[in-house]
Amino acid sequence: MLFRSSINNVVCHGIPSRDIVLKDGDIVNVDVTTILDGYYADASRMFMIGNVSDKARKLVEVTKECMEIGIKAIKPWGFVGDIGAVVEHHAHKHGYSVVEDLGGHGVGKKFHEEPFVAHFGKKNTGMLLVPGMVLTVEPMINMGARHVVLDPVDEWTIYTKDGSLSAQWEKTVLITETGTEILAD
């Protein structure tokens, strides 16, 4: 099992540390990867610590909505672009940006498989969504600009370039003949 925690302006891949103390008003994403019988699953959720500002609360809530509508957009024989189009529209409608450098991914015997699931784009584009595919929907939504930077020291943690807050929710989804099934929540 792998754990990552991303606080405030950390977009993803935050490294847990006993030296970091959460404080009143922080938002934190906890991302957990599990392996069962050689198959991977991935899920994350946001937590709000103490008295969170209305702006931070709205970002967390809208990001969850983005994930949910992204999952609802998945249809057998649809396209990966269908997911990104609805996520991007919902985020922009609320004044947020969508991280474009990172996204969801196929999951199976390997942690990251095809397809790359962009959380922006156009409907009816990208890879065909075939029953039996397993992928993550994990929009990373920023309060500021979409641009991100890699931590030069640990070369793993990714931050918003402008220091703005970022939120992420994630579920692992199986595409079935009739719709979807959530495998990791």
Task: Give each language-model segment a name.
Residues 1-185:
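Active-site neighborhoods and metal-handling regions in enzymes and metal-associated proteins
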